[in-house]
Amino acid sequence: SKFPALPDPEACSVPMVALGGISPATIDLCRQAGFYGVATLGYIWEKPEEALSRYIRLKTPFVLSIAGFDPSSGAGVTADLKTFETTGSYGLGVCSAITFQHEDSYTGTHWTTPEEIQRQCELLFQKHNPEFVKIGLVENFEVLDQLINYLIQKFPRLKIIWDPILKASAGHIFHENNTLQLNRILPRLFLITPNTEELYQLFGDSAELTRLQKIARTYRLNILWK
C-alpha cells in the first residue's frame, strides 16, 4: 500500500471515508484499501464530469457468485451474472463445479476443489471487495462450511447468501442434509433462498411458516421462500 499508516477499515464499527488529497490516481487505491467512500474537495470542481463518472464507478457494488457452470445458462454462475447486471451491480464469478446438462437432461458434475475455489477468490480479492456473496452449488456441506469460514475471515462484515442447490432442475440430487453442519452454517449467513422442496429437505417437518419464523429468529437469518 502507498498509505504510510493505513487503518484497518474492517476493524472499525462504522464506515470509514478517505479525506484529503483525493484524485483520480488515489480513488481506486482507497477502494482497494477497504474505505467505504472518499470525500473529494478541490478536484471535483476542476473536472466535474470526470469526477462524477468516477464516483458512479466507485459506488457500483461488487457482488460475487460462487456457483456451478451450467452450459445452458439456465442456472449457476452465468445466470447470476446476468441477474446482477440488471440490478446495476458489477458481478464477479467463481466456478465451484462444471455440470454436464441442458434444460432437460443431466449427465454429470466435475467438482472444483476447495483450494481451486479459494485460488479464484484470492485473485479477485486483490482487486475487488464484494459487499455480497451468493453461494450456489457446492460439493457438500463440509465444503460450504470451509468456504463460509474463509469468506468471513477475509471480510468480517460480508453478507453471505446461500441458494441451497440440493437437486438439479433435470432431477439429479447432489447431496443430502447434515443437521449438525447445518446448525453451524446458518448463524453465519445473511439470507437463504430455498424453494419449497429444499425447505423440507433442510428442515423436515419444521418447514411451516411459524416454525420457519422461529428458525429465522434463532439464527438471526433471513429466509426467502421461493
Question: What residue ranges belong to the model's regions?
Answer:
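Conserved N-terminal subdomain of the carbohydrate kinase-like
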Residues: 60-65, 81-169
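Hydrophobic faces of well-ordered beta-strands that scaffold small-molecule active sites
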Residues: 16-20, 38-40, 91-93, 160-162, ...
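Structural motif
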Residues: 32-34, 87, 218
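Conserved phosphate/ATP/ADP-binding segment of small-molecule kinases
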Residues: 173-226
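Glycine-rich phosphate-binding active-site loops on the catalytic face of alpha/beta enzymes
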Residues: 1-5, 27-58, 92-100
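Short beta-strand/loop segments at the ligand-binding rim of alpha/beta enzyme cores
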Residues: 10-19, 61, 157-160
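Glycine-rich beta-to-alpha transition loops that act as phosphate-gripper elements at the mouths
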Residues: 14-25, 76
